[in-house]
């Protein structure tokens, strides 16, 4: 597939289809990087696609359905991107939150979004999240990216990230086929404000609107800066803000 075909963002029905098409084209090329023990390590496009598909499959096996909200509490890391894409690949809606949120902020967002599942990265972030999740009338599942200390989890069902991202090429094909039911008018995510002016407010973003932004950003990077697909970008601003 020619790289030029990726300039036509209007042809994609949703963000996940765009990703899977891109992953097929890029294959084993590095996609996401993170530093571990002082050394940079990468995940390829193909491996990320398998993890995204595996995570989507696991969410559906938990009983999550199209339109269900999944809250994401994590610092910038490759798992953040995989979680976001996997949530949308399951037909669900990502609810990203700031790592600086207070317990009260988490409580408000959980109640306002009616999130059925919550993904949390570290034990430190879980300290402010768990009390709010335990009080939530809608939350059912906690998915931990890293091992968590033994804490009271009440009615919440606890799951480990590593168990939920086991996917293969067949899962990728199934996930891509399932995305035919998701259109540009479907909700992709609900981004909450920081709450500095009161309670955080959710802004609904649909697949089509984000694809339009992707199209505009790609044009600027390509025409104004002369960047191509081999460029490496450092993620500095919180992904939850984007």
Where are these regions (language model features)?
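AMP-dependent adenylate-forming
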Residues: 18-43, 150
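Conserved pre-ATP/AMP-binding loop-to-beta segment of ANL
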Residues: 27-30, 144, 159, 169-192, ...
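Conserved AMP-binding/adenylate-forming core of the ANL superfamily
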Residues: 31-85, 102-107, 160-165, 207-208
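Conserved AMP-binding A3 loop
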Residues: 42-46, 188-214
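Conserved structural elements of the adenylate-forming
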Residues: 49-54, 184, 203-225
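Short hydrophobic alpha-helices that are characteristic scaffold elements of the AMP-binding
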Residues: 85-93, 112, 241
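Conserved ATP-dependent adenylate/AMP-binding module captured primarily in the ANL superfamily
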Residues: 99-131, 213-234
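ANL superfamily adenylate-forming
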Residues: 126-184
């Amino acid at each position: 597939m020619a790289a030029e075909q990726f300039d036509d963002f209007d042809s994609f029905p949703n963000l996940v289809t765009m990703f899977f098409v891109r992953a097929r084209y890029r294959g084993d090329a590095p996609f996401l990087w993170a530093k571990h023990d002082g050394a940079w390590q990468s995940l390829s496009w193909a491996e990320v696609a398998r993890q995204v598909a595996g995570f989507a499959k696991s969410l559906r096996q938990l009983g999550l359905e199209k339109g269900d909200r999944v809250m994401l509490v994590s610092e910038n890391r490759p798992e953040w991107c995989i979680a976001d894409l996997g949530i949308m690949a399951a037909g669900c809606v990502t609810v990203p939150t700031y790592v600086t949120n207070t317990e009260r902020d988490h409580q408000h967002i959980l109640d306002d979004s009616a999130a059925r599942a919550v993904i949390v990265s570290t034990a430190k972030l879980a300290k402010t999240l768990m009390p709010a999740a335990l009080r939530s009338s809608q939350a059912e599942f906690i998915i931990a990216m890293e091992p968590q200390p033994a804490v009271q989890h009440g009615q919440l069902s606890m799951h480990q990230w590593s168990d939920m991202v086991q996917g293969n090429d067949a899962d990728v094909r199934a996930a891509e086929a399932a995305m035919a039911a998701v259109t540009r008018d479907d909700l992709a995510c609900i981004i909450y404000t920081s709450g500095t002016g009161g309670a955080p407010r959710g802004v609904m973003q649909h697949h089509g609107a984000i694809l339009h932004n992707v199209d505009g950003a790609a044009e600027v990077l390509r025409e104004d800066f002369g960047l191509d697909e081999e460029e490496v970008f450092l993620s500095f601003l919180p992904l939850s803000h984007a």
